[in-house]
Amino acid sequence: MSKLLNCLNEKDFSCVPVWFMRQAGRYLPEFRQIRLQNPDFLKLCFDSDLATEITLQPIKRFNLDAAIIFSDILVIPHALQQSIVFKEGLGPKCYDFNINKLLETKEKEYLSVLTPIYSAIKKTKKTLSKDKSLIAFVGAPWTLIIY
C-alpha cells in the first residue's frame, strides 16, 4: 500500500507522504517540450497518452509519493458544451455561457467527451508503481460557475 493510503487509513504515520499541487507543469523542461508540440492546452488534457506521460513526469524526476492526474477543472464545462478557451498569459476563460446547451447535454455525450480523462487515469494507475497513489480532482460547481 502507498504511504498516502497508509496515512489516510491510519496505519502508518512514520513517514509523511509528499506531493504538491500542480506538480506536473511548466516548470519541468520535459513538460515545456511537450507543450511546444501541443499548444492547445485543452487538447493536451484530452490526449490520454500525453496526459499519462505528463502525470508521471514529476514522479520520475522527484520520486514523490503521489501523482496528480494531468487535467483541468474546466474539462467539465467543456463536456457540458460550454466554450472554454485557454489563452497564453491570460489563462482559461469560459465564453458565452449557454445554459440551454448545458441543460440539453445528454449523459452519453457528456461521458463520451470525458472518456479520454478516464483513459488517462486507467493508464496512469496501470503504469504507476504500487507504492505511489494517484490523486484526481474536479472543480466544485461554485468554482466552475465563477469562470
Where would I find each of the regions flagged by the language model?
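N-terminal basic, low-complexity leaders that serve as flexible interaction/assembly modules and, when applicable
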Residues: M1-A79
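Gly/Ser/Thr-rich helix-start
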Residues: R26, Q82, A140
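Conserved alpha/beta-domain cores
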Residues: I54, I135-W142, I146
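A structural signal for short coil/turn segments at secondary-structure junctions
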Residues: F62, L128-S129
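Beta-hairpin (beta-strand-turn-beta-strand) motif
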Residues: D72-L74, G89, G139
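Aromatic- and acidic-residue-enriched segments that line the glycan-binding/catalytic groove
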Residues: A79-G91, T143-Y147
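A gly/proline- and charged-residue-enriched helix-loop-helix capping module
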Residues: G89-T127
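Proline-centered loop/turn at the N-terminus of a beta-strand
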Residues: D131-S133
